[in-house]
């Protein structure tokens, strides 16, 4: 069965082998429009919510439009066919070529925006793609693929450049990963591990657990609004949604008060009750996230846990615990539940940030609301995360937004920290092979002095100092030596 998909994908790709940059760009725009226009996006968002029971329709519409338009913005005028770069000084020319057939695995939490964005991204390099949807979101993902194929049809491109496994299973997905040229795994840890174990070159993503420091000098109202919006958006389906905030004690009351005013409820006496509902014992005897809470509304989660909140509540707040490594609320929660810590000095806040991220979600992302460049520098130079957002909503900013310079994507590499091959936002550049053409030029060999000169002079100076110090010690000791 998978072999048939592969054959059709290769035939389609071969049929566009002659396409110029302008022609493939036209294809990307046509495909993009079909998963961007208001009529189709509403259908996709509605299908995703109805099929998966996750998120909400208005936010999915907004997410879809932002992601697709953001990707197309980045692709506009970008070179992905033929000569893409030339260095006249080094006499180097770089030529882009397709990687081939890509097997793209998609998550249940984002079953339409992910294939839409990744489909366009993969097409940019004249590749073909076969999507393996999550079984619980197969109809929504197929709808997105059908819309994209309609875009291909309208510009006369082969429809089988984009395909989907209509009845997905672990076995079929495993076979797909073995037969394609490259795998893109956007989803949970087991999926990513399977991709890396397939024997096929693969790009994977790491688990999220985004944490923000709310510094004493920040714009409190702005920071609170951005955190609240990010955490409540689409019921926190995004892996970039803030899971914890670390608030300076001097602004703690104002910040939390603003979160409550915006529509948050601080769970205090019921904290243990909420924890026991959110993390249940699995088949292996370990406590893990309750699937019933993933991307559900704060009201639904609270009601199910037996906690009374009003209809207006969009985010549940819990106080952070000192035993971070043992506390479940320190982890990724995949729900509109936010853990709140407090700190006095920056180093204390930084250590909490580090512990939270090292405990879960290493390599993914963190952020800070501040205007203090020293704070920003410390986090940027020291944290083991691939992204640091400054004065931004994490869910919107990590994957690229119109208010920052991050590359637009729905797939976030987390580097070796997160068990991934790249720490970059995954874009079209990851789906082209590049041939380097090198021409001969007159040799420019550096002298030994240029490379080693400073070092050898330092060694010589150090040696001279060491000899003088040793001689001084000998002179000091000599009066006390016995004469035989």
From Swiss-Prot:
Characterize the pH dependence: Optimum pH is 9.0.
Q: Which E.C. number(s) belong to this protein?
A: 1.2.1.-
Q: For binding NAD(+), which residues are annotated in this chain's numbering?
A: 105-110, 188, 206, 332, 412
Catalytic positions are 239
UniProt entry keywords in alphabetical sequence: Carbohydrate metabolism, NAD, Oxidoreductase
- Taking the record's annotation, the residue ranges forming a coiled coil are none
The cross-references to InterPro entries, in alphabetical order and at most eight, read: Ald_DH/histidinol_DH, Ald_DH_C, Ald_DH_N, Aldehyde_DH_dom
Segment forming the signal sequence: none
Q: Please list the reactions this protein catalyses.
A: sulfoacetaldehyde + NAD(+) + CoA = sulfoacetyl-CoA + NADH + H(+)
Q: Which Pfam families match?
A: Aldedh
Check the record and name the CDD domains matching this protein.
ALDH_F20_ACDH
Would you identify the family this protein belongs to, as annotated? Belongs to the aldehyde dehydrogenase family.
The role this protein plays is: Part of a variant of the sulfo-TK pathway, a D-sulfoquinovose degradation pathway that produces sulfoacetate. Catalyzes the oxidation of sulfoacetaldehyde (SA) to sulfoacetyl-coenzyme A (sulfoacetyl-CoA). Is highly specific for NAD(+), with only residual (1%) activity with NADP(+). Cannot use acetaldehyde.
What is this protein identified as?
A: Sulfoacetaldehyde dehydrogenase
Q: Which organism is it from?
A: Acholeplasma sp
What is the organism lineage in this UniProt record?
Answer: Bacteria, Bacillati, Mycoplasmatota, Mollicutes, Acholeplasmatales
